[in-house]
């Protein structure tokens, strides 16, 4: 699609300095831009590229004063990063994520299924019995939707996703390729003989509205009750969420994190990559866990940053790490004193 600089400025609420009639057909990084493209400058360390970029337009802070003349037209805004994000979202919807409608055969549709308006079902998708798909749901090819699943309006289920029976998916959710929702929790009872007997997992999974689940992430069903992911939460690729976990609103969880069973995570928390969380622990609201940390106990008060293994509060961790880096010198001093 092609937009003029003027049209883009109107979309993001900016003011144009330069030629507003130029057509824009591509979004680029500032250092890789070409004629006919638009980019943005938010980080001062990239200012040098402003004077050499081939972009036709640059979104920039309205208080910015260039050191010398620039060739591209400028779109002045209050927050360049937020404005470019808005532009990306518009481009994504208009160009990359056009809503599909209808059925691609072959596709299986079970008994007593409730279909909303403008639903898309891709080839080789399987929809079980008593499923509800609300308006504008998109089910991409090679997807499995088990019996008694409900999926809210405008939700997108990408190829290869498996949603087991009885799970509830809210509105405006995105579940990326290969994710599994509702598989059995890891529950096994040790026996006197040394073997393990499987504990039936008869609960469900509830994903509230506006949730995004990354590729190949797994969310286990509860033993009893529900594994619950609350609205607005974003989960990266390759994350494991065990049975009966509760994740609060607007929390973000990075890739390769594993959260053990019956853990409760509050609202607005941030978990970095490769974090491990022990079962039956609790984190309060606005807890931040640094990458590769291992949380072994509860931090119910929230508003804390945790680092290390086992995870401790950031200030204490940094003090301990400073000492750790000096251990060799300290040992040498002790040897010299003997």
UniProtKB/Swiss-Prot annotation:
Q: Which Gene3D superfamilies match?
A: Hexapeptide repeat proteins (2.160.10.10), MurE/MurF, N-terminal domain (3.40.1390.10)
List GO molecular-function terms, semicolon-separated. Answer: N-acyltransferase activity
Q: Which pathway does the database say it acts in?
A: Bacterial outer membrane biogenesis; LPS lipid A biosynthesis
Q: Name one GO cellular component term.
A: membrane
Q: Name one GO biological process term.
A: lipid A biosynthetic process
Q: Name the InterPro entries for this protein.
A: Hexapep, LpxD, Trimer_LpxA-like_sf, UDP_GlcNAc_AcTrfase_non-rep
Which EC numbers characterise this protein's activity in its record?
2.3.1.191
Its EC top class is: transferase
UniProtKB keywords: Acyltransferase, Lipid A biosynthesis, Lipid biosynthesis, Lipid metabolism, Repeat, Transferase
Give the source's domain of life in one word. Bacteria
List, alphabetically, the SUPFAM superfamilies matched. Answer: Trimeric LpxA-like enzymes (SSF51161)
Would the keyword tRNA-binding be found if you checked this record's keyword annotation?
Answer: no
One matching Pfam family is: Hexapep
Q: Is the keyword Acyltransferase in the record? A: yes
- Name the catalytic site residues: 243 (proton acceptor)
Reactions catalysed: a UDP-3-O-[(3R)-3-hydroxyacyl]-alpha-D-glucosamine + a (3R)-hydroxyacyl-[ACP] = a UDP-2-N,3-O-bis[(3R)-3-hydroxyacyl]-alpha-D-glucosamine + holo-[ACP] + H(+)
Subunit-level organization? Homotrimer.
The protein's role, per its UniProt record? Catalyzes the N-acylation of UDP-3-O-acylglucosamine using 3-hydroxyacyl-ACP as the acyl donor. Is involved in the biosynthesis of lipid A, a phosphorylated glycolipid that anchors the lipopolysaccharide to the outer membrane of the cell.
Q: Which family does it belong to?
A: Belongs to the transferase hexapeptide repeat family. LpxD subfamily.
> What protein is this chain from?
UDP-3-O-acylglucosamine N-acyltransferase
